[in-house]
Amino acid sequence: MPEALALALYAAALRLLTPFYLLRLWRRGAKEALYRHALGERLGLHSGHAEPGRLWIHAVSLGETRAASALIDALRARDPALRFLLTHSTATGREAGESLLRDGDSQAWLPYDTPGAVRRFLRHWQPRVGVLMETEVWPTLQREAEAAGVPMVLANARLSEKSLRQGLRFASLMRPAARRMTLALAQTEADAERIRMMGTARVEVAGNLKYDIAVDPALIARGQAWAAQLGRPVLMLAVSREGEEAALLAEWVKQPAPRPLLAIVPRHPQRFDEIAALIEGAGFQLARRSSWAGEPPAEALQADVWLGDSMREMPLYYGLANVALLGGSFEPLGGQNLIEAAACGCPVLAGPHTFNFAEAAALAIQAGAAQRCRDLAEAVSRGLLLCANIGQRDAMAVDAMAFAAAHRGAARRMAESVLCLA
């Protein structure tokens, strides 16, 4: 199919779907109010005047925003006068991004990928360069940015074999979008090769920004202090996805007492209440992190399961846990970021599905920072053994921190490449 026809059909479909997207956001805003904030921005509608020439970074959700924080720090270190525009697509991303703003910076929703919305967005902000985090490539945005003379960079770029196949299925849309990318800064050589196959001409291997994310030592220390108060080991399911919590609870109920404390930290905040009901329905005494502000109360210290229903406290949870089971890896979802756990010195047990972080998982296992398990049953068994074996657990913790430290430097490399275009 010719590119022009493919783009026209794509834009027409998005225009038809836009009212339904907006209605969905409004309904979602009943639980997460931020989704109802500034809905006009989704259509590229902005009030007032914006100072042109900002460095624009788009981070779709929480994980991408945290990776962007390392890049922003590196860019500011090289040019303190830079002013940023941060855009997001999810409430968790926007909430996390707000903490990265300084005087003169701005924040907005990324507009829907229709020609009118994207043109209005680019006319209003007039960025000097656009940086898209990880996998965000939008056909209309790429075309309109090229027309407006805005160089576009795909930073911390990754592309799995599955995503490559999907992209090639829609080659008339995605190949031109990839060709219009000024520069892609890939996490690995394998990612770089797949991105070149999509059509991007200039691709550099820069490493993974997630090794450079600063972890708050005060939060780690707080988690460690809580662990000392508990007086028993802690096994955690970290950044869990749908289906994993129920499967873990089914395994956990089989384990003989006395058991370690089980902590569950879900990936999506809208599922907190659902997971709480699952835990109580399985017959366990539950303590919710959101129920106390200071030190954990006595009833929490005696609970069977802690639910990590708070935001931006993962270093605290990794400081609390003796061993972390990697969420998203026990269902075919690609896994979650294990680098943060390693940086906090928390040993990781991963399931079979880590294709979204394939190289990081392989390197962590090779370094002794993580172990691979066939399924949750094996992970629980190994986790209990590690909880009981202080020497092996401490050795994995040391290896984890060394692994994380050895792979830093991507933020500096990416900042230098981006500033060459700005």
Where are the regions that the model predicts?
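Nucleotide-activated sugar donor-binding and catalytic core shared by glycosyltransferases
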Residues: 1-422
